[in-house]
Amino acid sequence: MATPALSGQKVAVLPLTLAVPDLALSSDTLLSVRAKVLPWADSLVLEALTGRAPEVTWVGPRELRRAARRATGLATDPDHMGHALLRDPLLKVVPDPLRSQIRTLVALVDARYALVPASAVFLKEANGNVKVELKLVIVDARTGVPAWRSIAVGSATTPAMALRAALAAVLPVAGVQ
C-alpha cells in the first residue's frame, strides 16, 4: 500500500462485512460465528494500520459507527452498506447508492479516502496451516473511483497469525516481517 501518498491525511476504515471460512474451518469457534469474526478482524486490521502506517490518521470502524449514529437520517450504518461488492476487481467506479453512502460517511469524519476491507476468505492448507486472502480497496470518496486494490495473502498456524501475515505483506516495514 502506498501510505506515503496518504501521509498526513485521514482515511476512513470501513468494517469488514464478509468473512468466509472454507468447510475445513467451519467448526472453528471464531471463524464460524459471523458476530465474532467480523469485529475480531476489524481490530486486527486497525491494529496493523496504526502500527505499520502511523503517518496516516486512520479512522476506524468504531468511530465511523459513532459518526453515523450522530448523523441519523443522513448517514448509513457502515455495517450495512454492501461494500463487500468492491471485492470485484473489474469494478471501475463504485455504483450508487454505495458511492454516495461512502462519500457521506467519509465526509462526516473529515476524510477523503476510505479503506474498504472487501472480503476475507480463510482456507485450510494441506499442511494444516490457515491461509487468509484479504481483499482491500482504497476508494476516493469524491470521485467514487477505486484508487488502489490488493489481495493480501498470509499463511500461518492460526487465523490471527495468518491475518497478521497478510496485513504485514501489504503494509511492509523495512527490516520487519
Located regions from the model:
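Bacterial Sec signal peptide processing site at the extreme N-terminus
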Residues: M1-S7
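A short, hydrophobic beta-strand-centered structural micro-motif
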Residues: Q9-L16, V93-E125
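Acidic/histidine-rich, surface-exposed loop or edge segments in extracytoplasmic proteins
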Residues: Q9-S32, L85
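N-terminal segment of the mature soluble domain
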Residues: S27-A111
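Compositionally biased, intrinsically disordered linkers/stalks adjacent to structured regions
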Residues: L86-R87, V94-L98, A165-Q177
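Amphipathic beta-strand/beta-sheet edge segments enriched in Tyr/Trp
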Residues: S119-A156, R164
